Amino acid sequence: MRTSRVVHVVSCHAEGEVGDVIVGGVAPPPGETVWDQSRWIARDETLRNFVLNEPRGGVFRHVNLLVPPKDPRAQMGWIIMEPADTPPMSGSNAICVATVLLDTGIIPMQEPITRMVLEPPGGLIEVEAECRGGKAERIRVRNVPSFADRLDARIEVEGLGTITVDTAYGGDSFVLVDAASVGMRIAPDQARDLAEMGVRITRAANEQLGFRHPANDWSHISFCQFTDPLSERDGVLYGRNAVAIRPGKIDRSPTGTGCSARMAVLHARGRMKPGDRFVGRSIIDTEFHCSIADEVELNGKRAIRPIISGRAWVIGTKQLMVDPDDPFQNGYRLSDTWPMDL
Protein backbone atom coordinates (compact mmCIF):
# COMPACT_ATOMS: atom_id res chain seq x y z
CA MET A 1 0.00 0.00 0.00
CA ARG A 2 1.22 3.48 -0.82
CA THR A 3 1.05 6.03 1.98
CA SER A 4 2.94 9.13 3.06
CA ARG A 5 2.21 8.54 6.75
CA VAL A 6 0.96 5.85 9.11
CA VAL A 7 -0.75 6.70 12.41
CA HIS A 8 -1.34 3.81 14.82
CA VAL A 9 -4.61 4.01 16.75
CA VAL A 10 -6.30 1.89 19.41
CA SER A 11 -10.07 2.40 19.33
CA CYS A 12 -11.89 2.56 22.65
CA HIS A 13 -15.11 3.73 24.23
CA ALA A 14 -15.95 4.71 27.79
CA GLU A 15 -19.55 3.99 28.78
CA GLY A 16 -20.53 4.54 25.14
CA GLU A 17 -18.44 7.58 24.20
CA VAL A 18 -15.69 7.01 21.63
CA GLY A 19 -12.19 7.95 22.77
CA ASP A 20 -9.60 6.62 20.33
CA VAL A 21 -5.94 6.74 21.36
CA ILE A 22 -3.00 7.45 19.03
CA VAL A 23 -0.19 5.17 20.19
CA GLY A 24 2.34 5.74 17.40
CA GLY A 25 3.18 7.61 14.23
CA VAL A 26 2.81 11.18 15.56
CA ALA A 27 5.71 13.12 17.07
CA PRO A 28 5.05 15.17 20.22
CA PRO A 29 4.12 18.75 19.28
CA PRO A 30 6.25 21.72 20.35
CA GLY A 31 5.69 23.15 23.82
CA GLU A 32 7.28 23.45 27.24
CA THR A 33 4.17 22.05 28.95
CA VAL A 34 1.38 19.69 27.92
CA TRP A 35 -0.89 22.74 28.01
CA ASP A 36 1.39 24.51 25.51
CA GLN A 37 1.45 21.41 23.33
CA SER A 38 -2.34 21.25 23.32
CA ARG A 39 -2.56 24.91 22.30
CA TRP A 40 -0.15 24.18 19.41
CA ILE A 41 -2.35 21.28 18.27
CA ALA A 42 -5.43 23.52 18.48
CA ARG A 43 -3.84 26.32 16.45
CA ASP A 44 -2.19 24.12 13.84
CA GLU A 45 -5.28 21.93 13.22
CA THR A 46 -3.40 19.57 10.85
CA LEU A 47 -3.60 16.53 13.13
CA ARG A 48 -7.10 17.43 14.32
CA ASN A 49 -8.36 17.57 10.75
CA PHE A 50 -6.56 14.36 9.79
CA VAL A 51 -8.09 12.24 12.56
CA LEU A 52 -11.45 13.98 13.19
CA ASN A 53 -12.66 14.90 9.71
CA GLU A 54 -14.23 12.45 7.28
CA PRO A 55 -13.28 10.04 5.81
CA ARG A 56 -11.18 8.95 8.82
CA GLY A 57 -13.27 10.49 11.57
CA GLY A 58 -16.60 12.09 12.25
CA VAL A 59 -18.39 14.33 14.70
CA PHE A 60 -18.97 11.35 17.02
CA ARG A 61 -15.25 10.71 17.52
CA HIS A 62 -12.74 11.98 20.10
CA VAL A 63 -9.05 11.23 19.58
CA ASN A 64 -6.28 11.30 22.18
CA LEU A 65 -2.57 11.76 21.44
CA LEU A 66 -0.14 10.18 23.89
CA VAL A 67 2.88 12.39 24.64
CA PRO A 68 5.79 12.08 27.08
CA PRO A 69 4.86 13.72 30.38
CA LYS A 70 6.39 17.04 31.32
CA ASP A 71 5.85 16.56 35.06
CA PRO A 72 8.22 13.94 36.53
CA ARG A 73 5.41 12.62 38.73
CA ALA A 74 3.40 11.45 35.70
CA GLN A 75 3.82 8.22 33.76
CA MET A 76 2.19 9.56 30.59
CA GLY A 77 0.79 12.77 29.13
CA TRP A 78 -1.94 13.10 26.57
CA ILE A 79 -3.74 15.69 24.46
CA ILE A 80 -7.49 15.45 23.86
CA MET A 81 -8.96 16.34 20.48
CA GLU A 82 -12.74 16.81 20.36
CA PRO A 83 -14.81 17.97 17.36
CA ALA A 84 -14.72 21.67 18.28
CA ASP A 85 -12.13 21.94 21.06
CA THR A 86 -8.78 20.73 22.33
CA PRO A 87 -9.81 20.79 25.99
CA PRO A 88 -7.97 20.85 29.33
CA MET A 89 -9.42 17.54 30.52
CA SER A 90 -12.03 14.91 29.69
CA GLY A 91 -13.34 12.23 32.00
CA SER A 92 -14.43 9.70 29.38
CA ASN A 93 -11.19 10.22 27.46
CA ALA A 94 -9.14 9.82 30.65
CA ILE A 95 -10.87 6.48 31.23
CA CYS A 96 -10.19 5.43 27.62
CA VAL A 97 -6.53 6.48 27.79
CA ALA A 98 -5.94 4.68 31.09
CA THR A 99 -7.63 1.54 29.78
CA VAL A 100 -5.60 1.53 26.56
CA LEU A 101 -2.33 2.13 28.42
CA LEU A 102 -2.97 -0.87 30.65
CA ASP A 103 -4.76 -3.27 28.30
CA THR A 104 -2.07 -2.89 25.62
CA GLY A 105 0.83 -3.09 28.06
CA ILE A 106 2.19 0.39 27.38
CA ILE A 107 2.14 0.80 31.16
CA PRO A 108 2.60 -2.47 33.07
CA MET A 109 -0.56 -3.73 34.75
CA GLN A 110 -0.53 -4.73 38.41
CA GLU A 111 -3.47 -6.82 39.59
CA PRO A 112 -5.74 -6.22 41.41
CA ILE A 113 -4.97 -2.45 41.48
CA THR A 114 -2.73 -0.36 39.23
CA ARG A 115 -2.05 3.20 40.30
CA MET A 116 -0.61 5.85 38.02
CA VAL A 117 -0.46 9.59 37.45
CA LEU A 118 -1.41 11.00 34.05
CA GLU A 119 -0.91 14.49 32.68
CA PRO A 120 -3.66 16.00 30.53
CA PRO A 121 -3.30 19.67 29.55
CA GLY A 122 -5.39 20.85 32.51
CA GLY A 123 -3.17 19.37 35.24
CA LEU A 124 -2.19 16.09 36.85
CA ILE A 125 -4.80 13.44 37.59
CA GLU A 126 -4.41 10.40 39.80
CA VAL A 127 -5.71 7.13 38.38
CA GLU A 128 -6.57 3.89 40.15
CA ALA A 129 -7.47 0.95 37.91
CA GLU A 130 -9.19 -2.23 39.05
CA CYS A 131 -7.56 -4.98 36.99
CA ARG A 132 -8.35 -8.65 36.53
CA GLY A 133 -7.31 -11.23 33.97
CA GLY A 134 -5.28 -8.74 31.95
CA LYS A 135 -8.16 -6.26 31.68
CA ALA A 136 -8.56 -2.86 33.31
CA GLU A 137 -12.15 -3.33 34.44
CA ARG A 138 -12.86 0.01 36.13
CA ILE A 139 -10.95 3.29 36.15
CA ARG A 140 -11.12 5.71 39.04
CA VAL A 141 -9.92 9.26 38.30
CA ARG A 142 -9.15 11.97 40.84
CA ASN A 143 -9.99 14.94 38.66
CA VAL A 144 -8.58 18.46 38.48
CA PRO A 145 -10.02 21.18 40.76
CA SER A 146 -13.63 21.95 39.82
CA PHE A 147 -15.78 24.91 40.77
CA ALA A 148 -19.12 26.64 40.33
CA ASP A 149 -18.81 29.94 38.49
CA ARG A 150 -22.32 31.48 38.33
CA LEU A 151 -25.49 30.27 39.99
CA ASP A 152 -29.03 31.11 38.85
CA ALA A 153 -27.86 33.35 36.03
CA ARG A 154 -30.43 34.48 33.49
CA ILE A 155 -29.77 34.51 29.77
CA GLU A 156 -31.81 35.15 26.65
CA VAL A 157 -31.83 32.28 24.15
CA GLU A 158 -33.28 32.44 20.67
CA GLY A 159 -36.53 30.48 20.58
CA LEU A 160 -36.60 30.00 24.35
CA GLY A 161 -36.73 33.49 25.82
CA THR A 162 -35.23 34.02 29.28
CA ILE A 163 -33.91 30.90 31.00
CA THR A 164 -32.08 30.29 34.29
CA VAL A 165 -28.74 28.50 34.20
CA ASP A 166 -25.63 27.75 36.23
CA THR A 167 -22.07 27.76 34.92
CA ALA A 168 -19.26 25.62 36.26
CA TYR A 169 -15.90 24.03 35.49
CA GLY A 170 -15.11 20.35 35.96
CA GLY A 171 -12.00 20.02 33.81
CA ASP A 172 -13.95 21.76 31.04
CA SER A 173 -16.53 24.54 31.15
CA PHE A 174 -20.30 24.07 31.22
CA VAL A 175 -23.59 25.89 31.23
CA LEU A 176 -26.10 23.75 33.13
CA VAL A 177 -29.86 23.92 32.61
CA ASP A 178 -32.80 21.89 33.89
CA ALA A 179 -34.09 19.96 30.88
CA ALA A 180 -37.77 20.25 31.80
CA SER A 181 -37.46 24.02 32.22
CA VAL A 182 -36.79 24.31 28.48
CA GLY A 183 -39.39 21.70 27.50
CA MET A 184 -36.98 18.83 26.91
CA ARG A 185 -36.69 15.20 27.99
CA ILE A 186 -33.38 13.35 28.31
CA ALA A 187 -34.12 10.38 26.08
CA PRO A 188 -32.51 8.85 22.97
CA ASP A 189 -35.31 10.05 20.69
CA GLN A 190 -34.64 13.62 21.84
CA ALA A 191 -30.88 13.58 21.10
CA ARG A 192 -31.02 15.66 17.91
CA ASP A 193 -33.20 18.34 19.49
CA LEU A 194 -31.08 18.38 22.67
CA ALA A 195 -27.91 18.80 20.62
CA GLU A 196 -29.29 21.69 18.57
CA MET A 197 -30.79 23.48 21.57
CA GLY A 198 -27.68 22.88 23.65
CA VAL A 199 -25.44 24.55 21.11
CA ARG A 200 -27.78 27.58 21.06
CA ILE A 201 -27.70 27.79 24.85
CA THR A 202 -23.90 27.47 24.88
CA ARG A 203 -23.59 30.30 22.36
CA ALA A 204 -25.91 32.55 24.39
CA ALA A 205 -24.05 31.78 27.63
CA ASN A 206 -20.72 32.67 26.02
CA GLU A 207 -22.09 35.93 24.67
CA GLN A 208 -23.93 37.00 27.83
CA LEU A 209 -21.99 35.41 30.71
CA GLY A 210 -18.58 34.32 29.48
CA PHE A 211 -16.07 32.29 31.43
CA ARG A 212 -12.44 32.61 32.49
CA HIS A 213 -10.43 30.00 34.34
CA PRO A 214 -8.48 31.47 37.29
CA ALA A 215 -5.28 29.50 36.58
CA ASN A 216 -5.02 29.10 32.79
CA ASP A 217 -6.24 30.82 29.64
CA TRP A 218 -9.37 28.69 29.07
CA SER A 219 -11.84 31.47 28.37
CA HIS A 220 -15.08 30.12 26.94
CA ILE A 221 -17.96 27.81 27.82
CA SER A 222 -17.60 24.55 25.89
CA PHE A 223 -20.76 22.58 26.61
CA CYS A 224 -24.40 22.73 27.65
CA GLN A 225 -25.39 20.13 30.23
CA PHE A 226 -29.10 19.32 30.45
CA THR A 227 -30.03 17.87 33.83
CA ASP A 228 -32.96 15.97 35.28
CA PRO A 229 -33.96 16.35 38.95
CA LEU A 230 -31.89 14.46 41.49
CA SER A 231 -33.09 11.42 43.37
CA GLU A 232 -31.53 9.94 46.51
CA ARG A 233 -31.16 6.32 47.61
CA ASP A 234 -29.20 5.14 50.63
CA GLY A 235 -27.46 8.49 50.91
CA VAL A 236 -26.31 8.52 47.26
CA LEU A 237 -27.51 11.17 44.80
CA TYR A 238 -28.52 10.05 41.31
CA GLY A 239 -28.95 12.34 38.33
CA ARG A 240 -29.42 11.91 34.58
CA ASN A 241 -27.75 14.34 32.22
CA ALA A 242 -27.16 14.95 28.53
CA VAL A 243 -24.23 17.08 27.43
CA ALA A 244 -24.43 18.85 24.07
CA ILE A 245 -21.00 18.95 22.45
CA ARG A 246 -20.31 21.50 19.73
CA PRO A 247 -20.88 21.52 16.81
CA GLY A 248 -23.96 19.46 17.69
CA LYS A 249 -23.92 15.97 19.22
CA ILE A 250 -24.83 14.43 22.56
CA ASP A 251 -22.24 12.72 24.73
CA ARG A 252 -23.06 9.04 24.99
CA SER A 253 -21.33 8.77 28.37
CA PRO A 254 -22.39 10.61 31.54
CA THR A 255 -19.51 13.07 30.86
CA GLY A 256 -16.87 12.97 33.59
CA THR A 257 -16.09 16.68 33.49
CA GLY A 258 -19.84 17.34 33.40
CA CYS A 259 -20.45 15.22 36.51
CA SER A 260 -17.57 17.09 38.16
CA ALA A 261 -19.09 20.44 37.22
CA ARG A 262 -22.50 19.33 38.48
CA MET A 263 -21.00 18.22 41.80
CA ALA A 264 -19.25 21.59 42.07
CA VAL A 265 -22.64 23.30 41.68
CA LEU A 266 -24.23 20.96 44.23
CA HIS A 267 -21.34 21.67 46.62
CA ALA A 268 -21.77 25.42 46.15
CA ARG A 269 -25.48 25.04 46.95
CA GLY A 270 -24.77 22.99 50.07
CA ARG A 271 -26.19 19.77 48.59
CA MET A 272 -22.87 17.87 48.63
CA LYS A 273 -19.79 17.83 50.85
CA PRO A 274 -16.52 15.87 50.84
CA GLY A 275 -17.25 12.15 51.03
CA ASP A 276 -20.70 12.43 49.45
CA ARG A 277 -21.45 10.29 46.40
CA PHE A 278 -23.19 11.01 43.12
CA VAL A 279 -24.07 8.68 40.24
CA GLY A 280 -24.34 10.36 36.85
CA ARG A 281 -26.47 8.55 34.28
CA SER A 282 -26.22 9.17 30.53
CA ILE A 283 -28.79 9.37 27.77
CA ILE A 284 -28.08 5.67 27.02
CA ASP A 285 -28.28 4.67 30.72
CA THR A 286 -24.56 4.20 31.35
CA GLU A 287 -23.15 5.45 34.65
CA PHE A 288 -20.18 7.20 36.20
CA HIS A 289 -19.86 6.70 39.95
CA CYS A 290 -18.58 9.95 41.43
CA SER A 291 -17.79 11.60 44.74
CA ILE A 292 -16.16 14.67 46.24
CA ALA A 293 -12.68 13.88 47.56
CA ASP A 294 -12.00 17.19 49.27
CA GLU A 295 -12.30 20.95 49.14
CA VAL A 296 -9.47 23.03 47.69
CA GLU A 297 -8.71 26.61 46.74
CA LEU A 298 -7.82 27.55 43.19
CA ASN A 299 -6.23 30.99 42.99
CA GLY A 300 -8.64 32.26 45.62
CA LYS A 301 -11.66 30.42 44.22
CA ARG A 302 -13.48 27.78 46.27
CA ALA A 303 -13.25 24.43 44.50
CA ILE A 304 -13.54 20.67 44.97
CA ARG A 305 -11.50 17.66 43.85
CA PRO A 306 -13.98 15.25 42.26
CA ILE A 307 -13.55 11.53 41.76
CA ILE A 308 -14.97 9.89 38.63
CA SER A 309 -15.25 6.14 38.14
CA GLY A 310 -16.24 4.32 34.96
CA ARG A 311 -15.46 1.55 32.49
CA ALA A 312 -13.94 1.46 29.01
CA TRP A 313 -13.44 -1.21 26.39
CA VAL A 314 -10.92 -1.54 23.57
CA ILE A 315 -12.92 -2.15 20.38
CA GLY A 316 -10.22 -2.33 17.73
CA THR A 317 -6.90 -1.23 16.31
CA LYS A 318 -6.22 0.52 13.04
CA GLN A 319 -3.61 2.28 10.96
CA LEU A 320 -4.61 5.62 9.46
CA MET A 321 -2.93 6.24 6.11
CA VAL A 322 -2.91 8.87 3.38
CA ASP A 323 -2.12 8.30 -0.27
CA PRO A 324 -0.05 11.20 -1.70
CA ASP A 325 -2.63 11.57 -4.48
CA ASP A 326 -5.66 11.59 -2.17
CA PRO A 327 -7.48 14.90 -2.77
CA PHE A 328 -8.87 14.78 0.78
CA GLN A 329 -5.67 14.41 2.78
CA ASN A 330 -7.00 16.76 5.47
CA GLY A 331 -10.52 15.39 5.23
CA TYR A 332 -13.79 17.26 4.86
CA ARG A 333 -16.99 18.12 6.71
CA LEU A 334 -20.57 18.12 5.50
CA SER A 335 -23.48 19.68 7.35
CA ASP A 336 -25.61 16.52 7.20
CA THR A 337 -23.49 15.02 10.01
CA TRP A 338 -21.28 17.96 11.07
CA PRO A 339 -23.60 20.88 11.90
CA MET A 340 -22.21 24.17 10.65
CA ASP A 341 -24.96 26.70 11.24
CA LEU A 342 -26.03 26.12 14.86
From Swiss-Prot:
InterPro entries with a match to the protein in the record: Pro_racemase_fam
Functional summary from the UniProt entry: Catalyzes the dehydration of trans-3-hydroxy-L-proline (t3LHyp) to Delta(1)-pyrroline-2-carboxylate (Pyr2C). Is likely involved in a degradation pathway that converts t3LHyp to L-proline, which would allow P.denitrificans to grow on t3LHyp as a sole carbon source. Displays neither proline racemase activity nor 4-hydroxyproline 2-epimerase activity.
Enzyme Commission number: 4.2.1.77
Keyword Lyase in record: yes
Enzyme class: lyase
Catalysed reaction, written as an equation: trans-3-hydroxy-L-proline = 1-pyrroline-2-carboxylate + H2O
Highest taxon listed in the record's lineage: Bacteria
Location of the active site: 90 (proton acceptor)
Family, similarity comment: Belongs to the proline racemase family.
Keyword tRNA processing: no
Keyword vocabulary terms for this entry: Lyase
Name of this chain's protein: Trans-3-hydroxy-L-proline dehydratase
